[in-house]
Amino acid sequence: SNRNVLNVSCFKGAYVMKNLIQNCQNADVIGYWLASDLFSDYYDTKEILYGGCGLLTKDGIRKPSYYAFKFMNALGGQCIGKNENAVATRSGSKQISICCHNYKHFNFRYYLVEEDEIEVERQAGMFEDNERLQMTVRLKNVEEGTYQIKIYSVNQEFGNIQNEWEKIGYYNDLNLEEMEYLKSVTQPKIYLRQQKSVKGILEIETVLGAQEIQNIIVTEI
């Protein structure tokens, strides 16, 4: 449906990444319909976010689902590990890229209302749980040395246009400057740290909130 607020939420980002990880070794190319809400615009609403299923809003603001594709597009050509929540790849000999998610599926409450009647404020109660996921990625046979670990994260607080829209009171009549502000603040959080390998093993720990997606870039310094 193009009138479902979950299309704009972190849920959709985690859902997209989950499906891309499941199928990334089964297809050469994976497409998505559709790129922008411009192609599913409704004349009876002036809302900035009305639940369109595009990766971008009609004003060009990036949704969590957009970042799911962007993160996955940063993966290398050689898959070195994969499970239900993550995939790790190598690009050359110096860089490893990991994509991971903490997808949560619907509970019974989701099916009790029409898709176009779901309220933004009540999304959290429509999933099986909202528990965090502690994840450890163990990279073997790496060169001895120091590595830079860069984590891009999209969650309820960062890279989430719904959260930024809420901060301005769900206001719709925005001028150009205000719209550009929303575009600029809807960005993934970036974490940086350095870590040494031990006996050819590099262990990377991260925590993902419910419906959070991450792209972890590991580069030898």
Placement of each model-derived feature along the sequence:
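Aromatic/acidic polysaccharide-binding cleft in carbohydrate-active enzymes
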Residues: 1-119
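C-terminal beta-sandwich/jelly-roll accessory domains of carbohydrate-active enzymes
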Residues: 100-221
